[in-house]
């Protein structure tokens, strides 16, 4: 009667975090109802450029990924000061954006240098991190779409993602990131076998890529984020 269905968890809204949490009992809803519920959640999401003063809030999101997952190969949680410096350094050339729900930052994304040689100027590496309690709500997709719009304004062409890829998913890593990037239009272009060691395990690392513009002769010069920052206000 309703077409495709999906098993989902009963959910409860958490006023403190501004996110939806699964309860214990599972229910089955038609896919259109699931998408409707996601739409309600996403209605209250706003995007803005990150500020150095956001460092402590962003670090609260990032720290669990360092401590509990192999999504990042970083071993130690950086200090707030170091994280603030990372934001400042990124914003000198590339976008760094945050997603906000009910006045709380629930995710962030940023671009970084792919390689330092001049010929790589049209390439960036993207990263996205979400509050652990706010995953699978469409926030990552929204952040990536906004990033693509901003990077296109900068004349960036190639988007790259470096992703931990387990031969067998374990408690520290799944293949969710690879699947997410595939849904966002990224293609697998390379695998480095057992290139990262964390939690007493060797993990593969893969690269995925997406072109957001044509590869023309004499491409327009890349603009820094400060040069186009004012223009980004119209897409937030």
For every predicted segment, state its role:
Residues 46-58:
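A short beta-loop-alpha structural element at the N-terminal edge
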Residues 78-133, 145, 150, 154, ...:
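Acetyl-CoA-dependent GNAT
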Residues 127-135, 163-168:
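A short, internal acetyl-CoA/4′-phosphopantetheine-binding micro-motif in the GNAT/acyltransferase core
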């Amino acid at each position: 009667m309703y077409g495709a269905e999906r098993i989902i968890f009963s959910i409860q809204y958490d006023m403190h975090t501004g996110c939806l949490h699964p309860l214990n009992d599972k229910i089955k809803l038609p896919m259109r109802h699931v998408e409707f519920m996601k739409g309600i959640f996403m209605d209250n999401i706003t995007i803005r450029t990150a500020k150095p003063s956001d460092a402590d809030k962003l670090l609260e999101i990032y720290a669990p990924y360092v401590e509990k997952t192999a999504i990042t190969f970083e071993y130690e949680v950086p200090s707030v000061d170091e994280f603030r410096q990372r934001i400042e350094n990124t914003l000198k050339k590339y976008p760094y954006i945050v997603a906000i729900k009910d006045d709380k930052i629930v995710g962030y994304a940023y671009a970084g240098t792919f390689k330092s040689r001049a010929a790589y100027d049209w390439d960036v590496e993207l990263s996205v991190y979400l509050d652990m309690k706010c995953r699978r709500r469409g926030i990552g997709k929204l952040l990536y779409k906004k990033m693509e719009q901003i990077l296109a304004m900068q004349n960036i062409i190639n988007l790259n993602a470096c992703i931990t890829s387990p031969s067998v998913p374990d408690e520290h890593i799944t293949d969710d990131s690879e699947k997410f990037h595939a849904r966002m239009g990224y293609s697998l272009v390379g695998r480095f076998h057992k290139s990262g060691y964390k939690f007493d395990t060797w993990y593969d690392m893969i690269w995925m890529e997406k072109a957001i513009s044509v590869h023309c002769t004499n491409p327009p010069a890349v603009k820094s984020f400060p040069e186009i920052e004012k223009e980004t206000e119209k897409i937030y």
